[in-house]
Amino acid sequence: MVDTTNLIPNTPRYLKVPLIAFNTILWVLGLVLVIIGSIGVSFFSNFKDFTKVSKASAALSNLTTGAPAGVLVIGIFFVILTVIGCFVAGKEKLVGLVIYTMLMLIILVALIGVGGKALTLHNDDVVKQIGNAWEDVSNGPKNSTILKLENFLKCCYWNSTSSRNPLLCPKDSKGIPKYTDTCDSVISSKISSNLYLVGAAAVSIGVIEFICMLFALFLIIRICRAPRTKSYDYQ
């Protein structure tokens, strides 16, 4: 068996300083996730009625509710947990470091889940699924939901080949359509590329988080090997 004793620095400082530095980076990234999640929740709240009326697929429901809420919650936990991580690392609190590492593992799993969901939605071409639901609702009795979305997105009809329902497409006082862009192009520009960015960001943040966990584990091992009183962690 390989002896790993000499692989861990003898001085905890060389472990806790990088741990604090990486936690600071994660704190900033946590704020970014909070902002992205808040924007996503606000944006997709306008799709709530559309999702209900269209009897949307699971992928569409995940896009409008699960993904943005997941990003927001993970961001909030990052902001809180990284502050705690900096404190317990600086004070070399053994119990705190163990709890911190366990919580980071849970968040890492959640982050992988959200990132994987975002990439899956991107690869499954969720915009096409939105288009199918859009056409169904446009030709149904509750097409006023589509008119609200058109006003919000500032677009007219789903695409150039979709049916031209006279009740849809916002018009001015002269009956002229207010917007020239089709809704598929607007939604595609706002969703498709951003889903890929969320997935890529989740992978990047996950790597940094994994490094933090390694430093925390090494620091735990070093603290356990150092002579100390049992009451040290509770001071």
Swiss-Prot record:
Localisation per UniProt entry: Membrane
Membrane-protein topology: Multi-pass membrane protein
Main location: membrane
Record keyword Transport present: no
UniProt keyword annotations, A-Z: Glycoprotein, Membrane, Transmembrane, Transmembrane helix
Cellular component, GO annotation: membrane
Topological domains annotated Cytoplasmic: 1-23, 90-93, 222-235
Residue ranges annotated as Extracellular topological domain: 45-68, 115-200
Keyword Membrane on entry: yes
Top-level division of the source organism's lineage: Eukaryota
Membrane-spanning ranges: 24-44, 69-89, 94-114, 201-221
Annotated glycan sites: N62, N143, N159
Membership in a protein family: Belongs to the tetraspanin (TM4SF) family.
Name under which the protein is recorded: Probable tetraspanin tspB
Organism: Dictyostelium discoideum (Social amoeba)
Gene from which this protein is expressed: tspB
